[in-house]
Amino acid sequence: MSYRKAAVAAVGLALLASGAHAAPFEAVSFKKGQSALVYDVGSVRREGAMAQAWVYQIVAAPMDGASMVATFREFSCAMRRTRDIARRFVSPDGQTLRSVETPGEWQDVAPGDERFELMQQVCTGKPQRIAGQQMSVFDFQTVVRDALGAR
């Protein structure tokens, strides 16, 4: 079974069994090795050639206790660059382990870069939605980690 089919099946089951722990979000997901890169369609804000969105990297095996990194990311669509404005490192149970509130440096994003497809989706506003709409990000994290075979 492919990753997307497994994630969709797991999301469907989780929707039946779970309650929301945080505000619902609309997810679009990109698989990235043993992690998934997800952004909240509802958080996208555009002004001219600039866009901002909440992006979540969910990992199968926690790194320093964090199973998810929630990043408020800014995109310079015309210049094909991106930077992180703020980041939160979150445990599997939704606790913030640490946060970084200092904007990072701009980084160029070229075709082939893992952030390229994400930037195109955020900048063009044509996401392909997946199952799991209106789940909390924490419930979604659990479903994605299960689909990734979390340890």
Where are these regions (language model features)?
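Bacterial N-terminal signal peptides that target proteins for export
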Residues: M1-V8
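Intrinsic disorder/low-complexity segments in short proteins, especially the signal peptide
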Residues: A6, S18-H21
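N-terminal secretory-pathway/extracellular module detecting exported/lumenal segments
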Residues: A20-T71, F75-R151
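Bacterial N-terminal signal peptides
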Residues: A9-A17
